[in-house]
Amino acid sequence: MAGWTVCVDFLYTGDKMLEDACAVISGERVERVHTGGFRGQPDLDLRGRSSLALPGVIDMHVHLRGLKLSYKEDEVSGTAAAASGCVTLVADMPNTQPPLRTPEALREKLASLEAGAKVDYTVYAGVPRSYGEAVEMASMGIAGFKIYPEDLVNLDSIKNVLEAAEEAGILVVLHPESHDMFAGPDYGWLRRVARPCHAEAASVELLHDAARECGCKPRVHITHASCPATVVESKKRGFTVDVTPHHLFLSEEEVAGPTHSWGKVNPPLRGVGERSLLTQLTIEGLVDAIASDHAPHSTWEKWMHPAIAPPGFPWLEWWPGFTAARLMRAVGLERFYSMVSQTPSTILGVGDRCLWDGCPATISVLQLERTRVYHKGYTKALYTPVLGMESFDCAATVIRGKIAYTAWEGVRGGATGVLATRVVH
């Protein structure tokens, strides 16, 4: 599309709010932003819809599945779901099949994303077998390495990753749980007891100690913290930390009954008390980012007995609007923007997120009219514990100057996403 214009009711530039504003887009950049209407008919006119344009939303934690797990989700369906939810960039996790623990598997995943992604993307690698593989994978344009609880038993491999990440200037991301502290039945109302909060905080301390032992100082990020103590421990150690919408807004009592596997997720949903404290820490500014942990499965898998059903549920079609409807008033627009856009971009190292003259034309437009969560038909995961709950919706998604989605046309065709580390900022 040549130079074109989008107009909205409200536009947040990254430091101030404008009303009845238009952005003139030329190529992949915002040429100028102005208020007071537009002479003629804008190419994309979203006024009169309670529309709010923000610098593009980033999701630091998604599972697009793909490869041999494409029956759950794939790179096309997952990124289409992201576009429909106003997410402009996703960071894909490595626990697919084969797991992204070798350069060969990582190349296959990157090729699949290049062929099908409808939003921009980056990837985390798993913990490889050797330091040499870690160095090679760190040079392949990844966002960082992901450490899972089962990886923590091999500290030599962890130290290899810490060293390689520091050398390459990329992230080390930790799933904060320690398996050796799990106890009891791992399903239903007992999950938060079986996977206790102190297992989260202990894993953060363990990773900090491993980094100290090897003399490494990589950038460490703690993802999907479900407990207040995990957030506090992370900040104490100088790590960044994110939380998920489900840990902020759902409690075990609401959706994780003894026969209900739709709400089964790792780390588990907590009680009302932990959830309230986690929300308070978020409001107070201790949480750096919101990330979805979009973790799709087939419907038949989630109808299995809760003891064996896989953990996780889909979020990409809805989480920005769902979160904005519940949190934006409490934290303010500036803080909300920081947690879903600017700070994730800084942590991932993918360039600034702003919306004024000269900024990248990557824009999320939320519609601030309450609706209810429904299946939009993009993700392959046709279940969610938040079905029917109130939410804002996505009006439009623009990625590097191209319209990826509008609420009335849906997701546009073609693979338009690129590896975020290759975007010129």
UniProtKB/Swiss-Prot annotation:
Its EC number is 3.5.2.3. Keywords: Hydrolase, Metal-binding, Pyrimidine biosynthesis, Zinc. The keyword Metal-binding applies. GO terms for cellular component: cytoplasm. Substrate binds at H63, L64, R65, N95, H297, P311, G312. GO terms for molecular function: allantoinase activity; dihydroorotase activity; zinc ion binding. Pathway: Pyrimidine metabolism; UMP biosynthesis via de novo pathway; (S)-dihydroorotate from bicarbonate: step 3/3. PROSITE patterns: DIHYDROOROTASE_2 (PS00483). Zn(2+) 2 binds at K146, H175, H224. It catalyses: (S)-dihydroorotate + H2O = N-carbamoyl-L-aspartate + H(+). It comes from the Archaea. Binds 2 Zn(2+) ions per subunit. Pfam families: Amidohydro_1. PANTHER family: ALLANTOINASE. Catalyzes the reversible cyclization of carbamoyl aspartate to dihydroorotate. Belongs to the metallo-dependent hydrolases superfamily. DHOase family. Class I DHOase subfamily. This is Dihydroorotase. It comes from Aeropyrum pernix (strain ATCC 700893 / DSM 11879 / JCM 9820 / NBRC 100138 / K1). The gene is pyrC.
